[in-house]
């Protein structure tokens, strides 16, 4: 691992070129010719915190699959007349409390939606992605950002850029009423999970008054009163080029790709990145007691919540080591030992950073029946104090630093996991070099750094959480009793497809795995064969053992 720092900064696979298009959209390009595929993503620095408790950021992510004024319709002008009225009716619905009037408005929306569906080509965006070499199409909404991504074949880079930039120019909120049912099902599904409501309650208590206090999907009340006009304003405010990033990792030539990206993604609307006022969380005052209800008899659950740090905080690297002294993937932490020695039923530590705040917490399961919360907490504090007093060996400290560096490097070994890191780092406002430099910061950490960090964050001001057996009232979003919205043009194609078909497909020379050239094959003994390849990304060694026994499935 001594050479890891240099490998992280010099390996061709790990070079990321950062570029800005003429509209200020940021592009990160990572060439990797080890496989004939490209991972492509658009990152928007807008998430649930920018629409707290409304669910708009999440709604909007769903609607981005419904097409544009060119994709997903056979006649947008006629469709738009109906969509505009539907948007007005949703605004009226949100302002109406009378049950009879609400039912009347919802029926009008349903009638209009059924008529508008006559112009819709369902799932055309998804079909276009598949048609031009794309797989694993997906998206996700977090508190801080929204991601749109998929993997595709390199010869279709021009088509991918055209489709995915068109998607962001003028998205159309069609089939909204039927999509509401999907979101309702998501919300109800979360409510069915045993501890989900308790986690929501804790999150609200921990983060209030920050927008992180509210669920990403939004409250049930807000989900029943969506405003398409607010969704449009959300798009206009946050989906501007300067607030977005384009991530590509895979088999392409940077100099050939940049003109393609400029001619497509530079169409996205320019605009200043939105201003945000960051809400600072107040410190806990002493031992703040909180109880939550979970329908799990006999099992005791306890948590200690401290104030963590945001993603860009300089203390994060040292805090990671301090937390790993308590709990780590190798099971060698002080809390891990409590579990192994049967002093508690289970214990783990959490150190998660969002862009504006972080979660630092310990979750403990006291032993069945006779162990009290007080006794379990005393054991946990004893382990915390060991770190604060420097009661850990140099061998353990160096081992955990080495493990941290290995985790950094292993995440960069393949295209998909590397692109995931690129998306996260971009969304946090960091450069790629910032990420690579964190390995240097791990190297520079001393025992004293970790001791001081433990003293700084594991204080006597914390949230003390215990579980009570019980459940919270369940809020069910009922499935609306409307006429089904069934588009009639499932086999149709928009005029936009003709435009895509005229774009030349690049020639791709296939590469087939040749075990004689791409791997060293060594016969160790009869029926024992070693297949060996060089890790050209970093100096991590990995070994997989496959036994030729059992049925072949």
Where are these regions (language model features)?
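Short, conserved secondary-structure transition motifs
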Residues: 184-192, 280-294, 401-411
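Non-catalytic, conformational "gating/processing" segments within enzyme and secreted inhibitor domains
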Residues: 173, 180-181, 195, 199, ...
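Catalytic Zn2+-binding segment of zinc metalloproteases
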Residues: 62-73
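Active-site His/Glu-centered metal-binding helix of metallohydrolases
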Residues: 56-64, 322
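Proteolytic maturation boundary segments
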Residues: 1-28, 253-293, 301, 336, ...
């Amino acid at each position: 691992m001594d050479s890891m720092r240099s490998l992280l900064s010099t390996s061709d696979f790990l070079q990321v070129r950062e570029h800005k298009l003429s509209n200020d959209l940021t592009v990160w390009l990572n060439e990797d010719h080890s496989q004939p595929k490209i991972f492509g993503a658009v990152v928007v620095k807008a998430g649930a915190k920018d629409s707290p408790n409304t669910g708009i950021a999440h709604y909007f992510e769903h609607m981005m699959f419904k097409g544009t004024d060119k994709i997903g319709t056979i006649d947008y002008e006629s469709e738009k007349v109906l969509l505009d009225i539907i948007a007005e009716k949703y605004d009226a619905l949100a302002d109406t409390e009378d049950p009879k009037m609400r039912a009347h408005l919802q029926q009008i929306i349903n009638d209009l939606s059924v008529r508008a569906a006559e112009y819709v080509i369902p799932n055309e965006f998804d079909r276009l992605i598949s048609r031009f070499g794309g797989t694993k199409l997906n998206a996700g909404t977090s508190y801080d950002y929204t991601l749109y991504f998929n993997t595709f074949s390199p010869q279709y880079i021009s088509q991918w850029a055209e489709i995915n930039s068109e998607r962001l120019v003028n998205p159309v909120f069609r089939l909204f009423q039927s999509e509401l049912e999907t979101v309702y099902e998501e919300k109800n599904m979360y409510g069915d999970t045993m501890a989900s409501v308790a986690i929501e309650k804790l999150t609200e208590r921990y983060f209030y008054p920050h927008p992180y206090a509210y669920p990403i999907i939004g409250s049930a009340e807000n989900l029943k009163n969506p405003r398409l006009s607010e969704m449009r304003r959300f798009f206009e405010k946050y989906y501007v080029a300067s607030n977005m990033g384009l991530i590509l990792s895979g088999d392409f030539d940077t100099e050939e790709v940049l003109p393609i990206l400029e001619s497509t993604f530079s169409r996205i609307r320019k605009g200043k990145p939105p201003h945000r006022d960051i809400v600072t969380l107040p410190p806990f005052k002493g031992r703040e007691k909180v109880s939550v209800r979970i329908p799990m008899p006999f099992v005791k659950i306890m948590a200690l919540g401290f104030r963590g740090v945001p993603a860009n905080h300089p203390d994060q690297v040292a805090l990671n080591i301090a937390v790993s002294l308590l709990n780590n993937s190798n099971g060698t932490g002080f809390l891990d030992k409590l579990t192994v020695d049967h002093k508690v039923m289970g214990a783990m530590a959490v150190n998660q950073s969002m862009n504006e705040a972080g979660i630092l917490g310990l979750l403990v399961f006291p032993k069945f029946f006779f162990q009290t919360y007080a006794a379990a907490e005393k054991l946990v504090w004893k382990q915390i104090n060991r770190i604060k007093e420097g009661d850990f060996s140099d061998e353990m400290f160096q081992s955990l630093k080495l493990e941290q560096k290995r985790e950094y490097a292993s995440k960069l070994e393949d295209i998909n996991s590397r692109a995931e890191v690129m998306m996260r780092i971009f969304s946090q406002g960091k450069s790629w070099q910032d990420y690579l430099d964190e390995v240097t910061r791990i190297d520079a950490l001393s025992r004293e750094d970790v001791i001081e960090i433990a003293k700084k964050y594991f204080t006597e001001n914390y949230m003390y959480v215990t579980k009570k057996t019980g459940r919270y009232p369940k809020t069910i979003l009922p499935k609306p009793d409307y006429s089904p919205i069934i588009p009639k043009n499932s086999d149709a194609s928009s005029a936009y497809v003709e435009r895509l078909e005229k774009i030349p497909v690049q020639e791709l020379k296939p590469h087939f795995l040749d075990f004689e050239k791409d791997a060293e094959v060594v016969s160790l003994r009869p029926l024992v064969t070693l297949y060996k390849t060089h890790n050209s990304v970093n100096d991590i060694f990995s070994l997989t053992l496959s036994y030729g026994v059992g049925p072949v499935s």
